[in-house]
C-alpha cells in the first residue's frame, strides 16, 4: 500500500505569481490509478487555518468514500488569486458580465486564462507526476460560487476531458438569459459530462443564485441537454 500524502506545488500562472496547487493522494495500492477531481479555491479545501471561512474538509469526505467502498480519488485544489478571484473565475466569452457591483475592484473577466492554466499546465503536471486516470470517465472538475461557474465553463469547453462537473452555488447570474442561451446552443455535443448542480436559497444573494440556476436548468432542457446527464 502507498500511504496518504498531501503535496503543495507551485506552477507558473500567466502574468501573475506562481500559483499554489494542492494534490491530495489517498492511500492506494501500488500501481493503482485513481480517479481525479480538479477543484477551484484550493486554499479552502484542506486546511481550516488557510481561510477565514473554514475548509470543505475534503480529506474527510474522501476517507468516508473509501470506507463505504464507493471510490477513491485524488483531489487537486488550485488556489484562487485572492483579490483577483472574481476576475480569474469569470469567463469573457459567455457574454457581457452583469452585477459588476458585486465583483472585485478592477474586475476584468479572465476565466479563459484560468481554463488555459488548468488544461495546459495543471492537468499535464498532475498526469505526469501522480497516479491518476486520464480518461474522461474518471476525471471531474468542481467548484462553488465563481468557482462553480468556472467548473461549468471548463466542462462545457472540454467535454472530451471531463466526464463530471460539480457545480455548487454557481454564479450563473453573471450573464443574461439571452447570452446563456446563445452560449449553450454552440456547446452541446453528443457526449456531454454529467452535471451535479446544487445551490441553496438562504439569503438574498443565494436567492438570486437559486433563481439563475433554475433559469440555467430550463435552458439546458430547451437545448436538449441529455436528461440522464443532470441531477434533478
Feature-to-residue mapping (PLM):
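Non-catalytic cap/lid and distal C-terminal segments of serine-dependent acyl enzymes
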Residues: 1-232
Amino acid at each position: 500500500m502507498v500511504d496518504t500524502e498531501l503535496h503543495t506545488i507551485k506552477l507558473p500562472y500567466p502574468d501573475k505569481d506562481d500559483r499554489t496547487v494542492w494534490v491530495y493522494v489517498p492511500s492506494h495500492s501500488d500501481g493503482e490509478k485513481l480517479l481525479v477531481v480538479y477543484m477551484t479555491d484550493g486554499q479552502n479545501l484542506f486546511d481550516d487555518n488557510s481561510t477565514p471561512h473554514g475548509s470543505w474538509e475534503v480529506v474527510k469526505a474522501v476517507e468516508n468514500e473509501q470506507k463505504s467502498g464507493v471510490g477513491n480519488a485524488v483531489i487537486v485544489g488550485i488556489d484562487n488569486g485572492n483579490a483577483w478571484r472574481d476576475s480569474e473565475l469569470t469567463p469573457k466569452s459567455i457574454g457581457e458580465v452583469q452585477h459588476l457591483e458585486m465583483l472585485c475592484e478592477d474586475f476584468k473577466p479572465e476565466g479563459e486564462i484560468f481554463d488555459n492554466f488548468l488544461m495546459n499546465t495543471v492537468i499535464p503536471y498532475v498526469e505526469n507526476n501522480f497516479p491518476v486516470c486520464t480518461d474522461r470517465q474518471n476525471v471531474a472538475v468542481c467548484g462553488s460560487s465563481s468557482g462553480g461557474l468556472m467548473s461549468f465553463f471548463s466542462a462545457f469547453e472540454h467535454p472530451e476531458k471531463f466526464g463530471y462537473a460539480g457545480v455548487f452555488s454557481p454564479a450563473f447570474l453573471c450573464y443574461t438569459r439571452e447570452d446563456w442561451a446563445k452560449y449553450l446552443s454552440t456547446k452541446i455535443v453528443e457526449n456531454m459530462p454529467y452535471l451535479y448542480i446544487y445551490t441553496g436559497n438562504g439569503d438574498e444573494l443565494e436567492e438570486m443564485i437559486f433563481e439563475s440556476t433554475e433559469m440555467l436548468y430550463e435552458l439546458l432542457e430547451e437545448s436538449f441537454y441529455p436528461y440522464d446527464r443532470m441531477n434533478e
